[in-house]
């Protein structure tokens, strides 16, 4: 007598209505026959059978795998999302219980469970696997933008104690995304998403050797992609691959250093840089922000004639100095005058330039001179002079009380 398969659903209630009508009693490779709306989406090489479907309000990626791994993978996705890591949104897992497998043992017939599970995730729209992007002949600048996105994902994972375990191009999705940049507005970025969480391990922190092993494994995956491309008739310059590896390693080391400094900064100030200032790609900028805050702490302590905590000084500096200056940059469109610079970068670079010039001149040069020098060295045209004066005057209005208090303090 033929065994009737049993279907068990372990899915988020949001997606339950759509998922229950799919033909789970069949292997997903055969779903086209029952009229399931299969989506034709390019993807990288996969070890398991994967289909993409549109069902009701949602599009799903469905991977056929063992129940134990499927359960763990869904839990991993949930943990990654709680940590703010760019990854897939899990819908849950669905198990088909087939007829048990009979195994003859010395003590008699034993029946092993024969369960086939399916990891179900929400489909990320308008995204390409990096293995597809990797086959294209991009200019170095654009290739670096793709690699930057991947490095940021690595730093995000490792900074949160997450060991990917199967870091590879095939398990990475790349997507153009609009994100809000503080005091600048929406900008488009390339973002990398972790798209396979089977082997993810979440720890308190990762050792240097684990992080190094993860990167080396990823470098091996680049070689595998090269071999796959070669087999399909596409040849990629080995020199370019080696250059890419060096670029990834160098960028990773810099951004991981930034990540460590940001965490220390938050411990000292109770202030999240990413949330309030935006992304920073230079480790020294974190140190400079802290220096400015410590200076502001001294200033308000002198003004109030009492000790001020670093956390209180940070909040006051942000409210009375940083925000007003960045609003000047935004309102006067100075970000357009200095293309590619964020408001936070402009703040640091102009203030740092003032410190540098004052040290060279052995006197306080003032904001106006510092701004003019910064503009001149970064190639601002003559027609921006009136705008520059207007901006400088507004910046001076913000900084005047501090200028009066310690004109030459460094």
Protein language model regions, located:
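Low-complexity, highly charged intrinsically disordered N-terminal segments
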Residues: 2-10, 53, 64
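Conserved ATP-binding subdomain of kinase catalytic cores across diverse folds
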Residues: 20-132, 136-137, 153-160, 164, ...
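Activation-loop N-terminal segment of eukaryotic-like protein kinases
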Residues: 174-188
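C-lobe/activation-segment region of protein kinase-like
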Residues: 186-266
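Intrinsically disordered, low-complexity, repeat-rich regions
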Residues: 239-251, 269-273, 278-285, 290, ...
């Amino acid at each position: 007598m033929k065994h009737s398969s049993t279907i068990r659903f372990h899915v988020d209630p949001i997606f339950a209505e759509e998922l229950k009508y799919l033909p789970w009693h069949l292997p997903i490779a055969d779903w086209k026959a029952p009229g399931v709306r299969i989506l034709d989406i390019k993807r990288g090489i996969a070890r398991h059978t994967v289909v993409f479907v549109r069902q009701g309000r949602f599009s799903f990626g469905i991977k056929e795998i063992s129940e134990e791994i499927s359960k763990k993978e869904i839990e991993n996705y949930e943990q990654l999302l709680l940590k703010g890591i760019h990854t897939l949104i899990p819908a849950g897992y669905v198990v088909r219980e087939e007829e048990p497998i009979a195994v003859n043992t010395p003590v008699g017939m034993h029946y092993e469970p024969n369960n086939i599970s399916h990891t179900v995730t929400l489909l990320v729209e308008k995204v390409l696997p990096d293995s597809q992007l990797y086959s294209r002949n991009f200019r170095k600048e654009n290739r670096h933008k793709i690699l930057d996105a991947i490095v940021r994902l690595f730093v995000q994972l490792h900074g949160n104690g997450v060991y990917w375990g199967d870091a590879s191009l095939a398990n990475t999705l790349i997507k153009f995304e609009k994100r809000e940049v503080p005091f600048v507005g929406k900008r488009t970025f390339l973002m990398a998403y972790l798209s396979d969480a089977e082997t993810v391990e979440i720890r308190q922190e990762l050792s240097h050797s684990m992080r190094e092993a993860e990167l080396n494994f990823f470098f091996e995956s680049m070689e595998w992609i090269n071999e796959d491309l070669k087999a399909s008739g596409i040849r990629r310059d080995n020199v370019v691959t080696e250059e890419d590896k060096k670029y990834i390693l160098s960028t990773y080391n810099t951004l991981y250093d930034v990540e460590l400094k940001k965490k220390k900064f938050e411990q000292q100030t109770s202030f999240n840089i990413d949330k309030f200032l935006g992304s920073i790609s230079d480790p020294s900028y974190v140190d400079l922000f802290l220096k400015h805050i410590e200076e502001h702490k001294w200033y308000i302590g002198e003004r109030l004639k009492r000790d001020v905590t670093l956390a209180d000084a940070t909040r006051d500096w942000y409210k009375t100095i940083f925000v007003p200056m960045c609003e000047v940059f935004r309102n006067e469109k100075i970000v357009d005058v200095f293309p590619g610079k964020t408001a936070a970068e402009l703040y640091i670079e102009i203030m740092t330039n003032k410190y540098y010039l004052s040290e060279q001149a052995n006197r306080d040069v003032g904001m106006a001179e510092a701004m003019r020098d910064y503009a001149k060295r970064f190639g601002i045209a003559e027609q921006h002079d009136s705008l520059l004066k207007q901006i400088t005057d507004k910046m001076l209005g913000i900084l005047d009380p501090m200028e009066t208090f310690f004109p030459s303090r460094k």
